[in-house]
Amino acid sequence: MFYNLNGGSELKRAAVFFANGFEEVEALTVVDYLRRADIHVDMISTIDNKICRGAHGIDVAMDKLIDEISDDYDAYIFPGGSDNAASMRQNKKLLDKIKKVFNEDKLICAICASPTVLYEAGILAGKKITSYPGVFKNIEGGFDYLEEKVVVDGNLITSRGPALTVYFALEIIQALEGEEKRQQIENQILLAMM
C-alpha cells in the first residue's frame, strides 16, 4: 500500500505501459506530471526487457515487467509511437488485461497511435475517442471519432499526439485527484503561459 506523505491518505496508482518505439514526450511527460501530482506511477515493460527504447533512440529503464504486476492500479496508460502501439496490439496478455480492467471501471488512457491498442482489445464500441490523425483511417469500429485535443468518455481518456500530452496528463490527474490538484499542477508547469 502506498501513502501520500504530504497528506497521509492512500496514493492513487497508475501503470504506464511501454514497448520499443514508444513516443518519449507522451510517455515521460505523463509519468512526470502524475508524479508531481503525488500519484504513484510504475513504468511497465510489455517486452521481455526492463529497458525500452523510444522512437527517437532514448533508452528508459522500466520499474517492472508486465508479468510482475497485478490489477490493482487506478489507471492504465498507453503512450503512442507507431512501433509501440503495433507491439502492444500483438500482446494477448496485455489485451486481456485491458479488457478486464476496463470492465472493472478502471481508468484507461491512450494517446497518439495507442487508441488502436484499445480497439484491438475490443473496448471502444460506442465510445467517443480521438487519436493521432489517420491511425483509424482503414478501421470502422463502431466508435465516435472526434477531432479534439482530449476526449473523455466515462473511464476512457484519449488524445491526439505529442504536443497535446500536457492536456492529456492533466485530464488524467483530474480524473484521479480532482480539479484542485489539476489546477495546482497547471500553475506549477506555467500552463497559462502557453
Task: List each model region and its residues.
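Active-site-adjacent pocket-lining segments in enzyme domains
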Residues: R13-V16, F22, R35-S45, M62-K64, ...
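Short, solvent-exposed amphipathic alpha-helices that sit
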Residues: E26-R36
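Mobile, glycine-enriched helix-loop/loop "lid" segments at the mouths of ligand-binding/catalytic clefts
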Residues: K50-C52
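Short, Lys/Arg-enriched N-terminal segments with co-localized hydrophobic residues
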Residues: M1-L11
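Short glycine/proline-centered loop/turn elements that form peptide/ligand docking sites
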Residues: L28, S45-D48
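A cross-family phosphate/adenosyl-ligand binding-site feature
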Residues: G54-M62
